[in-house]
Amino acid sequence: MAVAPFDERSTMMYLAAEEPQMPLLPVWPEVVIGLICFGIVFFVFSKKLLPVINKTLEERREAIEGGIEKAESAQIEAQSVLEQYKAQLAEARHEAARLRQEAQEQGAVIIQEMKAEGQRQREEIIAAGHTQIEADRKAAASALRQDVGKLATDLAGKLVGESLQDHARQSGTVDRFLDELEAKAEAAR
């Protein structure tokens, strides 16, 4: 093979012909340089960047755990407040029921007292009415006796033809006559 001395194309072909054709095996100088670069990058990351990342991750983990603990404590506190609220609500309902029962009992007592007072007043009014009626009846009977006595005396005087002026006498006679009429009326009943 003849190769032109300074031709680029021919130089490339010459170099390509000299290298063995093994595409799966890496070139060792590249591997060594790659490992050194990887070690430098790994060292920089592990010394500079990794602590910052780990610190940030640890802070986030602590914040999350703290948030969970706070949420749990808040939930426990909320449950406690809910239980207190339920207890207060039950107590208020019990108190309201007790007050309602007391009000009903007091209302029943007041109604009974008012009924008794009304009955007593009714009986007093009836008794006063009976007393008044009896007094009016006696007054009317007395006035009627006097009027009947006077009319009877006048009528008797006209029938007899003489005046019966003896007041005491006529009064006794008329009273006696009316008493006899009342006794007969009561016996007939």
From Swiss-Prot:
<dbReference type="GO" id="GO:0005886">
    <property type="term" value="C:plasma membrane"/>
</dbReference>
<comment type="function">
    <text>Component of the F(0) channel, it forms part of the peripheral stalk, linking F(1) to F(0).</text>
</comment>
<keyword id="KW-1133">Transmembrane helix</keyword>
<keyword id="KW-0406">Ion transport</keyword>
<dbReference type="InterPro" id="IPR050059">
    <property type="entry name" value="ATP_synthase_B_chain"/>
</dbReference>
<keyword id="KW-0472">Membrane</keyword>
<keyword id="KW-0138">CF(0)</keyword>
<keyword id="KW-0066">ATP synthesis</keyword>
<protein>
    <recommendedName>
        <fullName>ATP synthase subunit b</fullName>
    </recommendedName>
</protein>
<keyword id="KW-0813">Transport</keyword>
<comment type="subunit">
    <text>F-type ATPases have 2 components, F(1) - the catalytic core - and F(0) - the membrane proton channel. F(1) has five subunits: alpha(3), beta(3), gamma(1), delta(1), epsilon(1). F(0) has three main subunits: a(1), b(2) and c(10-14). The alpha and beta chains form an alternating ring which encloses part of the gamma chain. F(1) is attached to F(0) by a central stalk formed by the gamma and epsilon chains, while a peripheral stalk is formed by the delta and b chains.</text>
</comment>
<comment type="similarity">
    <text>Belongs to the ATPase B chain family.</text>
</comment>
<dbReference type="GO" id="GO:0045259">
    <property type="term" value="C:proton-transporting ATP synthase complex"/>
</dbReference>
<dbReference type="InterPro" id="IPR005864">
    <property type="entry name" value="ATP_synth_F0_bsu_bac"/>
</dbReference>
<dbReference type="GO" id="GO:0046961">
    <property type="term" value="F:proton-transporting ATPase activity, rotational mechanism"/>
</dbReference>
<keyword id="KW-0375">Hydrogen ion transport</keyword>
<dbReference type="GO" id="GO:0046933">
    <property type="term" value="F:proton-transporting ATP synthase activity, rotational mechanism"/>
</dbReference>
<keyword id="KW-0812">Transmembrane</keyword>
<dbReference type="InterPro" id="IPR028987">
    <property type="entry name" value="ATP_synth_B-like_membr_sf"/>
</dbReference>
<keyword id="KW-1003">Cell membrane</keyword>
<dbReference type="InterPro" id="IPR002146">
    <property type="entry name" value="ATP_synth_b/b'su_bac/chlpt"/>
</dbReference>
<dbReference type="Pfam" id="PF00430">
    <property type="entry name" value="ATP-synt_B"/>
</dbReference>
<feature type="transmembrane region" description="Helical">
    <location>
        <begin position="25"/>
        <end position="45"/>
    </location>
</feature>
<comment type="function">
    <text>F(1)F(0) ATP synthase produces ATP from ADP in the presence of a proton or sodium gradient. F-type ATPases consist of two structural domains, F(1) containing the extramembraneous catalytic core and F(0) containing the membrane proton channel, linked together by a central stalk and a peripheral stalk. During catalysis, ATP synthesis in the catalytic domain of F(1) is coupled via a rotary mechanism of the central stalk subunits to proton translocation.</text>
</comment>
